[in-house]
A protein has these predicted regions:
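N-terminal intrinsically disordered, cationic/polar leader segments
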Residues: 2-168
Length: 168
């Protein structure tokens, strides 16, 4: 029995050390939340090391309560923003992603521009192998708009690119 208790203790110590390594540099997770509703930027996003960088897999974030403002009228635009990516060396931390998305609340920007901004900011901090950002904007003025931004790492060979496309 004592032998099993020692093994469990060692396993917990290894898991705790691994968790500490993964969370180095993360400041938002587990901290009081301060919301910025008008200044979206890559500085709001945090990343942690991908523990499986040798494997291609898809991470999907869906933000169904996205809100921004029309830069001409100031009217709110509502959308569901979906981010899908195949991580390289880093993954985005989910609370920082939520805070980043909330930062668009009082930000005036056209739907096409802000969808591209989200993609650009995520590419900047993650350097993903593949990334797609899709914004499905609610109907306003009788027209619904869907914007899709696609990125594939240009440094990958054609075989790898085909494999990444097959993941979708």
């Amino acid at each position: 029995m004592a032998d099993i208790t020692k093994k469990i203790g060692k396993a917990r110590a290894v898991a705790t050390k691994t968790e500490r390594t993964e969370t180095v540099g993360l400041t938002k997770l587990g901290s009081p939340t301060s919301y910025r509703f008008d200044k979206p930027g890559p500085d709001l996003l945090e990343a942690f090391p991908n523990r499986n960088p040798g494997r291609d897999y898809v991470v999907t974030f869906e933000h169904p309560e996205f809100t921004s403002l029309c830069p001409m009228t100031g009217q709110p635009d509502f959308a569901t923003i979906t981010v899908r990516y195949v991580p390289g060396e880093k993954c985005v931390e989910s609370k920082s992603f939520k805070l980043y998305m909330c930062a668009f609340r009082n930000h005036g920007s056209f739907m096409e521009s802000l969808t591209n901004k989200i993609a650009d900011d995520l590419i900047e901090i993650l350097a993903p192998r593949r990334l797609t950002v899709t914004g499905v904007f609610n109907v306003r003025g009788g027209t619904g708009i869907t914007v899709r931004v696609e990125h594939i790492d240009s440094g990958l060979d054609s075989t790898r690119v085909r494999a990444l496309r097959d993941l979708w």
